[in-house]
Amino acid sequence: MKLYELKPAPGSKKNRKRVGRGESSGHGKTSTRGHKGQWARSGGGVRPGFEGGQMPLTRRIPKRGFKNINKKVYTEVNVEKLERFDNDTVITPELLLKERVISKIEKDGVKILGRGELTKRLIVRVQKVSEGARKKIEASGGKVEVI
């Protein structure tokens, strides 16, 4: 096989339908839109979700729940992620961000959770610490300071 013998797979190249280019093209005059009516007009058609006047699905289904504006949002970090730091390191949200343990600090700060094991002696200064995480940090000789 030579380069000049290469051909696209059958059916992969389809000719564009050129409409409104004369009667003999087969797609002239009404340009495949039929006669008059909503669908023949420019911009014709219905908006998304319109169901011909019957009550749309989005309005038939009951409303549920609400957005709690007082919800606390923390960036969560498990103690196993703190194992990478050296003994006596002061762990702050800024340090976690700088060391790429977390990708961003949420509006209410950082919360340390208790998954995994911790053997290093660390000083942890964050906004919130779970009970399990506090026990693991203190068991390894570290300190927890809630800021």
Curated annotation (Swiss-Prot):
Skewed-composition ranges (Gly residues): 42-52
InterPro entries associated with the record: Ribosomal_uL15, Ribosomal_uL15/eL18, Ribosomal_uL15/eL18_sf, Ribosomal_uL15_bac-type, Ribosomal_uL15_CS
UniProt keyword annotations, A-Z: Ribonucleoprotein, Ribosomal protein, RNA-binding, rRNA-binding
SUPFAM superfamilies reported for this sequence: Ribosomal proteins L15p and L18e
GO biological process, one term: translation
Region (Disordered): 1-59
GO MF annotations in UniProt: rRNA binding; structural constituent of ribosome
GO cellular component entries: cytosolic large ribosomal subunit
Cited NCBIfam families: rplO_bact (TIGR01071)
Its job: Binds to the 23S rRNA.
Annotated family: Belongs to the universal ribosomal protein uL15 family.
Subunit-structure text: Part of the 50S ribosomal subunit.
Protein name: Large ribosomal subunit protein uL15
